[in-house]
């Protein structure tokens, strides 16, 4: 069982960026691409994962999601360009 919590950013087909929370990044991206994800992404498929971060607790992940959602597009793009820290838990 996966005990980690993730915040992720996907780039939509219209080049917009969507930030979300999940416990399974691969499943969530598949859901977005199948039209079963957030209402925002349904008309903007396909989406591509550009960034994710891993957390030990749901509250930490949701706090980070809220923080990233307040970022400008430029700051979100910077996160995507920096990549994902694969050494996270």
UniProtKB/Swiss-Prot annotation:
InterPro entries: GIY-YIG_endonuc, GIY-YIG_endonuc_sf, UPF0213_domain. Residues 3-78 form the GIY-YIG domain. It comes from the Archaea. Pfam families: GIY-YIG. Signal peptide: none annotated. Coiled coil: none annotated. Belongs to the UPF0213 family. This is UPF0213 protein HQ_3675A.
């Amino acid at each position: 069982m996966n005990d980690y919590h993730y915040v992720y950013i996907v780039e939509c087909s219209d080049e917009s960026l969507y930030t979300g929370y999940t416990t399974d990044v691969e499943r969530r991206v598949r859901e977005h691409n199948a039209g079963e994800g957030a209402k925002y992404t349904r008309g903007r498929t396909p989406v591509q994962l550009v960034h994710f971060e891993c957390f030990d607790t749901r509250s930490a992940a949701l706090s980070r999601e809220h923080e990233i959602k307040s970022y400008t597009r430029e700051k979100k793009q910077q996160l995507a360009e920096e990549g994902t820290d694969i050494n996270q838990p």
